């Protein structure tokens, strides 16, 4: 009796160990059974509901699919946050990575990136950047111009501080091209060095006011002594 019973116990233990090994193998390969960050999870299909702030990424292999909860969606997918769930959605067919369904960040081979779109070729007036395959406008900035007069409240005179500005134009690299190029400008703080007509320097005005107050005090003293 003991021999068949021991054999039966060993067989049951072997079955349990085999099932445990399969579960560990599935979790290690990223297929079903990886329930990290899940609210609802199954060994066969993985996660179906994720914890808050995580994205549900569903990977399909043939007719089977496996869910996984991730902090960031993998390359070729972008995250969509919703009231019920956050999901990873696949980018467009020509996008390698994207910010949304309508805005690509990097295109697949043989496509060129222009204003978030992946195009077969760059539009007229643009050139392809060799490393990024981005379409860039053919503009070369000219040297900076001279600084403008220092202006405060629309005036070039006064006291205190104002702003001075300089500009440079970004013209087409080739004169025959008609790319739309922008004007660049920058401003910086500057001191107003010239007083407006009829205006006194605040420092001189303060000194004059102090002198007048001092003179009035001196005038009062003899009057006060005489009244005593």
From Swiss-Prot:
Under the heading CDD domains, the entry gives: FU
Recorded GO molecular functions are: heparin binding
Q: Which UniProt keywords apply?
A: Disulfide bond, Glycoprotein, Heparin-binding, Secreted, Sensory transduction, Signal, Wnt signaling pathway
Major localisation: secreted
- Locate the TSP type-1 domain: which residues? 138-197
Keyword Signal assigned to the entry: answer is: yes
Renumbered to this chain, region (Disordered) spans 193-228
SMART domains associated with the record = FU (SM00261), TSP1 (SM00209)
InterPro entries xref list: Furin_repeat, Growth_fac_rcpt_cys_sf, R-spondin, Rspo_Fu-CRD_dom, TSP1_rpt
Spans of the FU repeats? 85-128
Biased-composition ranges, Basic residues, are: 203-228
Glycan-carrying positions: 34
Cystine residue pairs:
35-41, 38-47, 50-69, 73-88, 91-98, 95-104, 107-118, 122-135, 139-181, 150-157, 190-196
Q: Which Pfam families match?
A: Furin-like_2
The UniProt entry's GO CC annotations, sorted and at most eight, read:
extracellular region
Q: Which GO terms describe its biological process?
A: nail development; positive regulation of Wnt signaling pathway; Wnt signaling pathway
Signal peptide range:
1-19
**Location of the protein in the cell:** Secreted
Q: Cross-referenced SUPFAM superfamilies, in alphabetical order?
A: Growth factor receptor domain
Q: What does this protein do?
A: Activator of the canonical Wnt signaling pathway by acting as a ligand for LGR4-6 receptors. Upon binding to LGR4-6 (LGR4, LGR5 or LGR6), LGR4-6 associate with phosphorylated LRP6 and frizzled receptors that are activated by extracellular Wnt receptors, triggering the canonical Wnt signaling pathway to increase expression of target genes. Also regulates the canonical Wnt/beta-catenin-dependent pathway and non-canonical Wnt signaling by acting as an inhibitor of ZNRF3, an important regulator of the Wnt signaling pathway.
Could you describe the subunit structure of this protein?
Binds heparin. Interacts with LGR4, LGR5 and LGR6.
Its name, as the record gives it, is R-spondin-4
């Amino acid at each position: 009796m003991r021999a068949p019973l021991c054999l039966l116990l060993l067989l049951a233990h072997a079955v349990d160990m085999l099932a445990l090994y399969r579960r560990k193998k599935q979790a290690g390969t990223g297929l079903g059974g990886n329930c990290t960050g899940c609210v609802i999870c199954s060994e066969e299909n993985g996660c179906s509901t994720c914890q808050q702030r995580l994205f549900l990424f569903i990977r399909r292999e043939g007719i089977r699919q496996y869910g996984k909860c991730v902090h960031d969606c993998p390359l070729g997918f972008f995250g969509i946050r919703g009231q019920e769930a956050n999901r990873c959605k696949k980018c467009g067919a020509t996008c390698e990575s994207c910010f949304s369904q309508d805005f690509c960040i990097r295109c697949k081979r043989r496509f060129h990136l222009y204003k978030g779109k992946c195009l077969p070729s760059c539009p007229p007036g643009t050139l392809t950047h060799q490393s990024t395959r981005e379409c860039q406008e053919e503009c070369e900035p000219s040297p900076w111009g001279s600084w403008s007069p220092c202006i405060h409240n629309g005036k070039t005179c006064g006291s205190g501080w104002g702003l001075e500005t300089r500009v440079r134009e970004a013209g087409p690299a080739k004169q025959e091209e008609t790319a739309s190029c922008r004007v660049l400008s920058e401003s910086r703080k500057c001191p107003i060095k010239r007083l407006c007509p009829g205006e006194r320097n605040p420092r001189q005005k303060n000194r004059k006011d102090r002198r007048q107050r001092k003179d009035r005090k001196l005038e009062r003293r003899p009057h006060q002594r005489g009244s005593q």
